[in-house]
Amino acid sequence: MSLSLWQQCLARLQDELPATEFSMWIRPLQAELSDNTLALYAPNRFVLDWVRDKYLNNINGLLNDFCGSEVPLLRFEVGSKPAVRAHSHPVTASVSAPVAPVTRSAPVRPSWDSSPAQPELSYRSNVNPKHTFDNFVEGKSNQLARAAARQVADNPGGAYNPLFLYGGTGLGKTHLLHAVGNGIMARKANAKVVYMHSERFVQDMVKALQNNAIEEFKRYYRSVDALLIDDIQFFANKERSQEEFFHTFNALLEGNQQIILTSDRYPKEINGVEDRLKSRFGWGLTVAIEPPELETRVAILMKKADENDIRLPGEVAFFIAKRLRSNVRELEGALNRVIANANFTGRAITIDFVREALRDLLALQEKLVTIDNIQKTVAEYYKIKVADLLSKRRSRSVARPRQMAMALAKELTNHSLPEIGDAFGGRDHTTVLHACRKIEQLREESHDIKEDFSNLIRTLSS
């Protein structure tokens, strides 16, 4: 049996799985082949259960492919693989992947769980106790982000450091930041967890410079157990703040202290931020949060209504969720308005009542046919992610919806072909033109494509 068995499995899994899933769940595994048994070691119980639940069939299938009649037994354990023993063959996870350009030095402080408190500094946590994992509504759009955040809360300073969450406004990034903070402090009551908006870091640094207290500023930020910074894109063009955060970032990572960052865009797409910082943002795990799909939007509304002791009929929740697709904050704001109107008037919450209470918001939504809106609608219709439409993937399950979205953008907006191409991952105008012609051809040849196009036009224009 080849000593490279696990490397072969890894190579195939890397091809078959989305990059985020592979990095998050498969790459942390260690493997050891001994006495016809392949032992896979997960860093914690959470990862072990997830891999066994989601990827066991994939792994068993690959073992059958590679080993034929000599398939080894598969065993899962929590922890690290033991030191190399006689007659055993260690198997490492060395598949081709980007490697961080520096080697981290050994930690210069005790491990996270054993780090002593430093009472001479006063830490302002700012973590909102109301935002927890329990009241975060999970769906396909945020499942990976929630799972990564949960693991960081259980094992801060571990494999996913830094954790970088990105996505549009109002999708739950801030909620997850607070949930991680609450999770860490639940495990260790005196944990030094600091949450802040990136602008607060800038303000603190400016104040420290003005008061000749920069050393105290450095000591404060470099001695926390976990630093949670929201909207890191606001560091753009603030060179001195970036310089200081660069050194803070390095110090925290070397000390095994957890860093979690959020942004409205992928790290490499943040303009005005130094390349060395953007590179470091991707050293751990980067996860996108997509706009919630219909089922998740309905669940969010029902949970919010339940928290307010309001009976929300399912058909009303569906009516609201179907018309407000952009983000969680907009959904919750709309529901708050409906609840307030119901309380003021004493009327029952029905679809007709919601039409009246939200008439201006619904009218505005009906006028908003933008490329972003088209992308979200098409992604939801074909049950893929917006990120897939913007990616370089060429499989038919992604390429055809991408062509459909481009054709709809040309049909329903005033954007030029180059502008549409730019909105779809920087493609050129000839790609957009080809997509439009292809969909036009398929609408004549395929009843399904013709129906899809009509349904999407109706949804976007209604």
UniProtKB/Swiss-Prot annotation:
The keyword Glycoprotein does not apply. Residues 126-342 are annotated as: Domain III, AAA+ region. GO terms for cellular component: cytoplasm; plasma membrane. SMART domains: AAA, Bac_DnaA_C. GO terms for biological process: DNA replication initiation; regulation of DNA replication. InterPro entries: AAA+_ATPase (IPR003593), Chromosome_initiator_DnaA (IPR001957), Chromosome_initiator_DnaA-like (IPR020591), Chromosome_initiator_DnaA_CS (IPR018312), DnaA_C (IPR013159), DnaA_dom (IPR013317), DnaA_N_dom (IPR024633), DnaA_N_sf (IPR038454). Pfam families: Bac_DnaA, Bac_DnaA_C, DnaA_N. Residues 105-127 are annotated as: Disordered. Keywords: ATP-binding, Cytoplasm, DNA replication, DNA-binding, Lipid-binding, Nucleotide-binding. ATP binds at residues 170, 172-174. SUPFAM superfamilies: P-loop containing nucleoside triphosphate hydrolases, TrpR-like. Domain I is involved in oligomerization and binding regulators, domain II is flexibile and of varying length in different bacteria, domain III forms the AAA+ region, while domain IV binds dsDNA. PANTHER family: CHROMOSOMAL REPLICATION INITIATOR PROTEIN DNAA. Plays an essential role in the initiation and regulation of chromosomal replication. ATP-DnaA binds to the origin of replication (oriC) to initiate formation of the DNA replication initiation complex once per cell cycle. Binds the DnaA box (a 9 base pair repeat at the origin) and separates the double-stranded (ds)DNA. Forms a right-handed helical filament on oriC DNA; dsDNA binds to the exterior of the filament while single-stranded (ss)DNA is stabiized in the filament's interior. Belongs to the DnaA family. This is Chromosomal replication initiator protein DnaA. It comes from Yersinia enterocolitica serotype O:8 / biotype 1B (strain NCTC 13174 / 8081).
